[in-house]
């Protein structure tokens, strides 16, 4: 039975699309006020991707002007979500897991911790760990948590939606993974368990 859980935040505990207004409207307005050096069409595509991919990765992919990036990064470091967010309809499957639960999320610390606060779920988790993807990745943070809390990898299940991040890194460390893939974006990705929702999460955890 698994009784330690490393859980992603964005598009796992809650979905960004239904919360887009609260999460993104202010950021979109800010970016529209800048000369990003890309076409409107590319900006629309970038906005879509921002809902599921860390901002720095999106900016790199779509070629945002490098000279404006320090200003944008500074803005994002100081940004907080201040309106209530709604957890996913399946969140009760996560909440009812027995054991120690850690949120491991990529992004900007102030922004990510404010999301947890606005979701009203902070008390459901032992700790929240925000990964700065510009300097490290989730694999290094998983290793850090295992060492810090003296955890056995056989007891851990990693839950998330990113096949190229938490799922891939979990498997590389020999840890069981649950890939949440509602839109079947990763049909060929490796994962110990997978689902279009979280209804079989307890079975995967052996609970």
Where would I find each of the regions flagged by the language model?
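Active-site neighborhood of HAD-like aspartate-dependent phosphohydrolases
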Residues: 1-40
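Asp-based, Mg2+/Mn2+-dependent phosphohydrolase catalytic module
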Residues: 1-3, 102, 111-207
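A metal-dependent, Asp-based hydrolase signature
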Residues: 30-34, 44-79
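Solvent-exposed loop/turn and edge beta-strand elements of beta-rich ligand-binding domains
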Residues: 37-40, 68, 125, 179
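Short, acidic loop-to-helix structural element flanking the phosphoryl-transfer center
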Residues: 78-103, 139
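Conserved phosphate-coupling serine/threonine residues in phosphotransfer and NTP-handling enzymes
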Residues: 105-107
